[in-house]
Amino acid sequence: MIRQTKTENGLVRGIEAADPRITAFRGVPFAAPPTGKNRWRAPQPCENWEGIKDCARFAPISVQDTPGIGDSLYNREWHVDQDVPMDEDCLYLNIWTGAKSVDDRRPVLVWYFGGGYQWGYTREMEFDGERLARQGVVVVTVNYRVNVFGFLSHPQLTKEQPEAPSNFGSLDQKAGLEWVVRNIANFGGDPNKITIAGQSCLLYTSDAADD
């Protein structure tokens, strides 16, 4: 099993999943924190780190409103657990792999959560990739900015960054996918066999992706 491996920015250590044949790498950074000077900007490259980064826990989710538990199925689905930490520093992804070595070259599924660009996060129980990883797939779930931090439209922001007007969350999704292409081989995945999937509004991502 691959319990420790390298990324382009440094070494990471995963954790044994409930099924000991699967390793989960949670909270792997794929871009610099979108805070301070990086707020409302396209995602910037992640800095290198020394030593081994412990990737046993999920990273905080993107800052978002909590719609609460109402009568509708939609509100009940997207009720944000009050115990889940939120932070602007949220550009992390999670990987589940059952590969025995980096030479396995298993097919890869990259999953994006939906939520009307307002809510959602990768640590929801239904997005846990362990079960699918048992079938020989390397599963990746990508966090991205939502709500005002991901899709705020303002003339000043458009003036400063005409190449990315109001679509910072979409650029996060693209950056996550590009990171997967560059790094997934070190988790036993095949960068030439990547399937993109999404829920609700994020179904468009698979159609928007190019070579």
Region locations from a protein language model:
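Short, solvent-exposed turn/loop segments enriched in Gly/Ser/Thr/Pro and often Arg
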Residues: 145-148, 197-201
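Alpha/beta-hydrolase fold nucleophile elbow
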Residues: 189-199
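Amphipathic alpha-helical segments in well-structured domains
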Residues: 125-129, 170-173, 177, 203
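Generic structural signal for alpha-helix termini and adjacent loop/cap motifs
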Residues: 99, 182-183, 187
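Short helix-terminating capping/connector loops at secondary-structure junctions
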Residues: 102-105, 187-191
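Non-catalytic accessory segments of hydrolases
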Residues: 1-167
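Alpha/beta-hydrolase active-site loop
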Residues: 164-184
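Conserved small/polar residues in nucleotide/adenosyl-binding loops
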Residues: 204-211
